[in-house]
Amino acid sequence: MRIGHGFDVHAFGGEGPIIIGGVRISYEKGLLAHSDGDVALHALTDALLGAAALGDIGKLFPDTDPAFKGADSRELLREAWRRIQAKGYTLGNVDVTIIAQAPKMLPHIPQMRVFIAEDLGCHMDDVNVKATTTEKLGFTGRGEGIACEAVALLMKAAK
């Protein structure tokens, strides 16, 4: 078994909506990013890549490459997952924690789980997504941005 951890942050800027966990969420602010700014899928992709010792999302999809300008993070996740499977790994489970004072994530979590399970080709029981606030402390609490942490467990596929 191998475990990976991912973390991502994006500052608010411009106008919404935002995309979190592949879900378009109405919000008055947007997120500043080279791609679509999906902190949940970026953290998850990093966790998966880390568990497989394949570096990180910035190495695989550099923000200096114009090809990834405005990229759909679901596509990035699927490409990373293909590379991980090519190394002979299967998924144990993933757990994602979104850290945001606003907007509220709870109504969107079921669809996030559906999208992640689809992208990883796994059962929804292998995908957990939750959200928390920082009780108005720090940059997320002040409404300056959104953060996310994720962990992923991989196993070598049986031969």
Curated annotation (Swiss-Prot):
Signal peptide: none annotated. The keyword rRNA-binding does not apply. Disulfide bonds: none annotated. The record marks H34, T133 as: Transition state stabilizer. A divalent metal cation binds at D8, H10, H42. It catalyses: 4-CDP-2-C-methyl-D-erythritol 2-phosphate = 2-C-methyl-D-erythritol 2,4-cyclic diphosphate + CMP. InterPro entries: MECDP_synthase, MECDP_synthase_CS, MECDP_synthase_sf. GO terms for molecular function: 2-C-methyl-D-erythritol 2,4-cyclodiphosphate synthase activity; metal ion binding. It comes from the Bacteria. GO terms for biological process: isopentenyl diphosphate biosynthetic process, methylerythritol 4-phosphate pathway; terpenoid biosynthetic process. Keywords: Isoprene biosynthesis, Lyase, Metal-binding. It is an enzyme of class 4 (lyase). 4-CDP-2-C-methyl-D-erythritol 2-phosphate binds at residues 8-10, 34-35, 56-58, 61-65, 100-106, 132-135, 139, 142. Binds 1 divalent metal cation per subunit. Pathway: Isoprenoid biosynthesis; isopentenyl diphosphate biosynthesis via DXP pathway; isopentenyl diphosphate from 1-deoxy-D-xylulose 5-phosphate: step 4/6. Its EC number is 4.6.1.12. Its cofactor is a divalent metal cation. Pfam families: YgbB. Homotrimer. Involved in the biosynthesis of isopentenyl diphosphate (IPP) and dimethylallyl diphosphate (DMAPP), two major building blocks of isoprenoid compounds. Catalyzes the conversion of 4-diphosphocytidyl-2-C-methyl-D-erythritol 2-phosphate (CDP-ME2P) to 2-C-methyl-D-erythritol 2,4-cyclodiphosphate (ME-CPP) with a corresponding release of cytidine 5-monophosphate (CMP). Belongs to the IspF family. This is 2-C-methyl-D-erythritol 2,4-cyclodiphosphate synthase. It comes from Salmonella dublin (strain CT_02021853).
